[in-house]
Amino acid sequence: MNRLAVELPGLSLKNPIMPASGCFGFGREYAQFYDLSVLGAIMIKATTKEPRFGNSTPRVAETPSGMLNAIGLQNPGLDKVLAEELPWLEQFDVPIIANIAGSTMEEYVEVAAAISKAPNVHALELNISCPNVKKGGIAFGTVPEVAAELTRLVKEVSAVPVYVKLSPNVTDIVAMAKAIEQAGADGLTMINTLVGMRIDVKTGRPILANGTGGLSGPAVKPIAVRMIYEVSQAVSIPIIGMGGVQTAEDVLEFFYAGASAVAVGTANFIDPFVCPTIINELPVLLDELGIRHISECTGRSWKTGAHAVHCRS
C-alpha cells in the first residue's frame, strides 16, 4: 500500500506534495536537481492568452519571515505553453495542474478551453486574484458573485476538473468558498498571497516598483491554516493547501486543518530539494505518530471535537 497516495477529482497522486504555481516556473530549472516524476503533481506558472512581461523591477523583496513579490504574471503566453512547455513536461510521470489567469472572463474561458485539452493537463487552477479590467480593476476573487460566475463559465468549457485558488484578501473567505462550490468547482486551492508592502527608509519610497506585492512564506502559514480550518468545515469539495509550507510537519498541520494535498511555494527558492525532502520525510513522521495513511489526517483537528474560534481580536 502506498500510504501517501491521494485521489482527488482528476488527480491520482502518488503523494500529496506539489510545487505551487509561480514558484517552480515550468519545472525546467528544478529538473536539473532531481527527477520531477517523484512529485505528486506540478502546478505550472500562470498562463494567459498573450505573453506577459510582468511588472517593472524591483519586483521581489525579502521580509523577516518570507518575501514580497509583484512579478505581474510574467509568462510566455498560451501558444508557447502549449507548443513547448507542456510537451517538455510529458517526459515526466506526473500530472500537471495548469494555473490560468486573465484580464476578462472571455480570456479565462479561451485559455481554459485550449489548455485543458493538453494530454498531460489533469486539472486547472483558476487564479481569481487578477484584476477585472471591465469592472474597474477589482479582482475577480473579491466578490463572491463574480468569482462564481467566472467559475461557471470556465467549468462549461474545461475538459478537466477545475480548482479555484482563493485569495485571503477578502472579508469572508468562507462565503467565497461556498459560492464557488455552488458554481461547480471541483476543488479549492488556498491560500494565495496576502497584499503587503515594504518601504526603503533611506528613500522613503516603496521597495517594490509596483508599490505593493504578495506576501508569502512562513509568515502567512498561521493564516493559511486558520482559513483552511474554517473553509474545510463549510464545503464538501477537497482543498489543496498552501502558504508557508517548509517541512513534513507543516504538511501534516495543513492536513489536520482540512487539506487533502499540499503545495510548497516560497521554500523552493530557499532549497530546490524541499519537495522531495518532504516526500521522503512524510512516511517517517507518519510512523512516529502511528498513522497508517496520510488521508486519515484530513480534518482531524475538527473531526475530533476541536472547535473553530469565532471571536477574533
UniProtKB/Swiss-Prot annotation:
SUPFAM superfamilies: FMN-linked oxidoreductases. Its EC number is 1.3.1.14. Binds 1 FMN per subunit. InterPro entries: Aldolase_TIM, DHO_dehydrogenase, DHOD_1B, Dihydroorotate_DH_1, Dihydroorotate_DH_1_2, Dihydroorotate_DH_cat, Dihydroorotate_DH_CS, Dihydroorotate_DH_I. It is found in: Cytoplasm. Substrate binds at residues 45, 69-73, 127, 192-193. PANTHER family: DIHYDROOROTATE DEHYDROGENASE (FUMARATE), DIHYDROOROTATE DEHYDROGENASE (QUINONE), MITOCHONDRIAL-RELATED. This is Dihydroorotate dehydrogenase B (NAD(+)), catalytic subunit.
